[in-house]
A protein has these predicted regions:
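N-terminal leader/capping segments at the start of a protein or of a new domain
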Residues: 1-37, 42
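Hydrophobic beta-strand-centered segment that forms part of the acyl-chain substrate-binding groove
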Residues: 2, 9-18, 85-124, 148-150, ...
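Hydrophobic core residues within well-ordered beta-strands of beta-rich domains
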Residues: 34-36, 121, 135
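Residue-level recognition of beta-strand microenvironments
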Residues: 43-45, 114, 128-130, 156
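Flexible glycine-rich active-site/ligand-binding loops centered on an Asp-His dyad
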Residues: 73, 141-163
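Acidic, glycine-enriched active-site microenvironments
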Residues: 118, 129-142, 146-149
Length: 164
Protein backbone atom coordinates (compact mmCIF):
# COMPACT_ATOMS: atom_id res chain seq x y z
CA UNK A 1 0.00 0.00 0.00
CA UNK A 2 1.48 3.40 -0.94
CA UNK A 3 2.08 5.92 1.84
CA UNK A 4 -0.10 8.95 2.47
CA UNK A 5 0.61 11.84 0.08
CA UNK A 6 2.61 14.81 1.35
CA UNK A 7 0.58 17.19 -0.78
CA UNK A 8 -2.63 16.97 -2.77
CA UNK A 9 -1.31 16.57 -6.32
CA UNK A 10 -4.17 18.67 -7.68
CA UNK A 11 -2.67 21.63 -5.74
CA UNK A 12 0.53 21.46 -7.78
CA UNK A 13 0.50 23.84 -10.74
CA UNK A 14 3.27 22.38 -12.88
CA UNK A 15 3.03 25.36 -15.22
CA UNK A 16 3.85 27.79 -12.41
CA UNK A 17 7.62 27.45 -12.17
CA UNK A 18 9.13 28.99 -9.03
CA UNK A 19 12.70 28.06 -10.01
CA UNK A 20 13.94 26.91 -13.41
CA UNK A 21 17.30 25.22 -14.08
CA UNK A 22 19.16 28.54 -13.94
CA UNK A 23 17.66 29.36 -10.55
CA UNK A 24 18.28 25.83 -9.26
CA UNK A 25 21.97 26.20 -10.22
CA UNK A 26 22.26 29.12 -7.80
CA UNK A 27 21.71 26.67 -4.94
CA UNK A 28 22.74 23.23 -6.24
CA UNK A 29 26.29 22.36 -7.37
CA UNK A 30 25.41 19.62 -9.90
CA UNK A 31 26.07 20.41 -13.57
CA UNK A 32 25.73 18.92 -17.04
CA UNK A 33 24.40 15.37 -17.21
CA UNK A 34 24.10 15.21 -13.41
CA UNK A 35 21.53 18.03 -13.23
CA UNK A 36 18.43 15.98 -12.54
CA UNK A 37 15.85 18.70 -11.79
CA UNK A 38 14.16 20.91 -14.38
CA UNK A 39 11.94 23.01 -12.12
CA UNK A 40 10.71 23.73 -8.61
CA UNK A 41 6.94 24.22 -8.63
CA UNK A 42 5.94 24.20 -4.95
CA UNK A 43 7.80 25.50 -1.92
CA UNK A 44 6.24 25.70 1.54
CA UNK A 45 9.00 26.13 4.14
CA UNK A 46 6.53 26.35 7.04
CA UNK A 47 5.10 22.92 6.19
CA UNK A 48 8.53 21.58 5.19
CA UNK A 49 7.29 20.59 1.73
CA UNK A 50 8.83 21.12 -1.70
CA UNK A 51 7.95 19.78 -5.16
CA UNK A 52 9.78 19.82 -8.44
CA UNK A 53 10.01 17.84 -11.63
CA UNK A 54 12.33 16.19 -14.09
CA UNK A 55 11.29 15.88 -17.71
CA UNK A 56 12.70 12.53 -18.78
CA UNK A 57 14.19 12.98 -22.26
CA UNK A 58 15.06 10.52 -25.03
CA UNK A 59 18.54 12.07 -25.43
CA UNK A 60 19.76 11.43 -21.87
CA UNK A 61 23.08 9.65 -21.36
CA UNK A 62 21.55 6.48 -19.87
CA UNK A 63 18.89 5.81 -22.55
CA UNK A 64 20.98 3.69 -24.97
CA UNK A 65 22.26 1.36 -22.26
CA UNK A 66 19.59 1.06 -19.56
CA UNK A 67 17.27 -1.54 -21.00
CA UNK A 68 17.97 -1.16 -24.74
CA UNK A 69 14.79 -1.09 -26.83
CA UNK A 70 12.77 -0.30 -23.67
CA UNK A 71 14.57 2.47 -21.77
CA UNK A 72 13.70 2.88 -18.09
CA UNK A 73 14.90 5.75 -15.91
CA UNK A 74 17.36 4.13 -13.50
CA UNK A 75 16.20 4.14 -9.89
CA UNK A 76 19.52 5.62 -8.84
CA UNK A 77 18.72 8.74 -10.92
CA UNK A 78 15.30 9.03 -9.29
CA UNK A 79 17.15 8.96 -5.97
CA UNK A 80 19.65 11.56 -7.19
CA UNK A 81 16.86 13.85 -8.41
CA UNK A 82 15.25 13.52 -4.97
CA UNK A 83 18.52 14.38 -3.24
CA UNK A 84 18.86 17.47 -5.42
CA UNK A 85 15.31 18.54 -4.54
CA UNK A 86 16.09 18.21 -0.83
CA UNK A 87 19.38 20.04 -1.31
CA UNK A 88 17.56 22.91 -2.97
CA UNK A 89 15.07 23.10 -0.09
CA UNK A 90 17.88 23.45 2.45
CA UNK A 91 20.09 25.78 0.41
CA UNK A 92 17.25 28.13 -0.54
CA UNK A 93 16.59 28.68 3.16
CA UNK A 94 20.23 28.64 4.24
CA UNK A 95 19.46 25.80 6.66
CA UNK A 96 22.82 24.05 6.62
CA UNK A 97 26.33 25.15 7.38
CA UNK A 98 28.72 24.17 4.64
CA UNK A 99 28.74 24.61 0.90
CA UNK A 100 25.91 22.23 0.03
CA UNK A 101 23.77 19.37 1.30
CA UNK A 102 25.45 16.07 0.45
CA UNK A 103 23.85 12.70 -0.07
CA UNK A 104 24.06 10.84 3.24
CA UNK A 105 22.03 7.72 2.49
CA UNK A 106 18.60 6.30 1.80
CA UNK A 107 16.27 3.95 3.62
CA UNK A 108 12.90 2.39 2.94
CA UNK A 109 13.27 2.83 -0.82
CA UNK A 110 10.44 1.34 -2.90
CA UNK A 111 9.96 1.53 -6.66
CA UNK A 112 6.33 1.01 -7.60
CA UNK A 113 6.20 1.65 -11.33
CA UNK A 114 8.37 2.48 -14.33
CA UNK A 115 9.50 5.89 -15.55
CA UNK A 116 10.31 6.21 -19.26
CA UNK A 117 11.52 8.87 -21.68
CA UNK A 118 8.66 11.27 -22.39
CA UNK A 119 7.41 11.09 -18.79
CA UNK A 120 7.45 13.97 -16.34
CA UNK A 121 8.66 12.73 -12.96
CA UNK A 122 7.20 14.94 -10.22
CA UNK A 123 9.00 14.65 -6.89
CA UNK A 124 7.59 15.83 -3.56
CA UNK A 125 9.82 16.08 -0.51
CA UNK A 126 8.83 16.58 3.11
CA UNK A 127 11.27 17.55 5.84
CA UNK A 128 10.93 14.99 8.63
CA UNK A 129 13.86 15.78 10.93
CA UNK A 130 16.44 18.54 11.06
CA UNK A 131 19.72 18.38 12.93
CA UNK A 132 22.75 20.49 12.08
CA UNK A 133 24.71 17.39 11.01
CA UNK A 134 21.94 15.33 9.44
CA UNK A 135 18.66 16.08 7.73
CA UNK A 136 15.92 13.56 6.98
CA UNK A 137 13.36 13.94 4.20
CA UNK A 138 10.67 11.62 2.96
CA UNK A 139 10.30 11.81 -0.80
CA UNK A 140 7.63 10.60 -3.20
CA UNK A 141 7.81 10.43 -6.99
CA UNK A 142 4.88 10.50 -9.39
CA UNK A 143 4.15 10.12 -13.08
CA UNK A 144 0.70 11.59 -13.52
CA UNK A 145 -1.19 10.50 -10.42
CA UNK A 146 0.72 7.23 -10.06
CA UNK A 147 3.25 7.03 -7.24
CA UNK A 148 6.30 5.46 -8.86
CA UNK A 149 8.65 5.51 -5.86
CA UNK A 150 9.04 6.67 -2.27
CA UNK A 151 11.98 6.76 0.13
CA UNK A 152 13.57 8.31 3.17
CA UNK A 153 16.64 10.32 2.23
CA UNK A 154 19.41 11.53 4.51
CA UNK A 155 21.40 14.65 3.80
CA UNK A 156 24.52 15.98 5.46
CA UNK A 157 26.25 19.34 5.14
CA UNK A 158 29.39 19.24 2.98
CA UNK A 159 32.16 21.83 3.07
CA UNK A 160 34.62 22.08 0.21
CA UNK A 161 37.39 22.74 2.73
CA UNK A 162 38.55 19.58 4.44
CA UNK A 163 38.47 19.60 8.20
CA UNK A 164 41.82 19.09 9.93
Amino acid sequence: MPPELHVDLSRLDLGHVLADRAAIRKHNPQRYEMEQLDAIVYFDPAAGVIAGYKDVRYDEFWVPGHMPDYPLLPGVLMCEASAQLCGYFCAAQDLVKGDFLGFGGMENVRFRSQVRPGDRLVIVGKLVKFHRRQILFNVQGFVGETMVFHADILGMPISRQQEA
